[in-house]
Amino acid sequence: MVLDELISEFDRGLRSLTGISRMSRPVPAPADAPDAELTPAERTHAAGLMRVNHVGEVCAQALYQAQKLTARTASAKAMFEEAAREEEDHLAWTAHRLKELDSRPSLLNPLWYAGALAIGVAAGALGDKVSLGFMAETERQVESHLEGHMSELPATDTASRAIVDQMRIDEVKHGKAATDAGGIELPLPARMLMRAASKVMTSTAYYL
């Protein structure tokens, strides 16, 4: 681990928390009709869901930063770096959509980031196979979560739906890549604990 790498990751963390993340791909555009006018209730609900998704991407940045820094092999480091770059697109897309919905990111983002960073360090300390397994399970749970949001978002909110759908596609790819790279299946108690922690985060971030 070199100083340049630490500085680079520190910069990425600051960008994650300050809302100035760079996107390498444009914001996904709806394939069908543009947004119809959302009712105030629909707009509030969509904003809450997109705030949850934004928090998830803040956590993803912290997780993959920590896992990259603690990875043993160059191949694992490269995989975490690639996933982090695509997740940074997600971070920028969800921030963009929150602004369009006249809303804001979670007020607790520094807390979410710090917690995810600690979890990523712990996963990385257990070795690459466990760390990659943690990545695969994380992506599976995120995929399920995003599928739920697709059913909850207003049908007329085509902008949010386009973003969430592309995020889901990317998460599936990340999870498969982690499994193919040798990630092991986590034990049931670990998977259940991850779901419980995710439930606390999503329930809180919807409002705060």
UniProtKB/Swiss-Prot annotation:
It is an enzyme of class 1 (oxidoreductase). It is found in: Cell membrane. Its EC number is 1.14.99.60. Fe cation 2 binds at residues 87, 139, 171, 174. Binds 2 iron ions per subunit. Its main location: membrane. It catalyses: a 5-methoxy-2-methyl-3-(all-trans-polyprenyl)benzene-1,4-diol + AH2 + O2 = a 3-demethylubiquinol + A + H2O. GO terms for molecular function: 3-demethoxyubiquinol 3-hydroxylase activity; metal ion binding. Its cofactor is Fe cation. Gene3D superfamilies: 1.20.1260.10. Fe cation 1 binds at residues 57, 87, 90, 171. This is 3-demethoxyubiquinol 3-hydroxylase.
